[in-house]
Amino acid sequence: MTASSSDGAHGAVDRKLLDILVCPITKGPLEFDAARQELISRGARLAYPIRDGIPIMLPEEARKID
């Protein structure tokens, strides 16, 4: 998984947490999009939101991506 460092402006996510999270659908790696505060699953083509520093790993909460 690739994780960018966060400046805390949008709510920091613990780097260790990002290193262990995987997509709940594909079990594949996630990429951290700091600008959008999302975890991206390329395999599932979904973006999981991060709210108040907490990743919301529910497929029904994820945004579909192209």
UniProtKB/Swiss-Prot annotation:
It comes from the Bacteria. Pfam families: Trm112p (PF03966). InterPro entries: Trm112-like. GO terms for cellular component: cytosol. SUPFAM superfamilies: Trm112p-like. Belongs to the UPF0434 family. This is UPF0434 protein RPE_0408. It comes from Rhodopseudomonas palustris (strain BisA53).
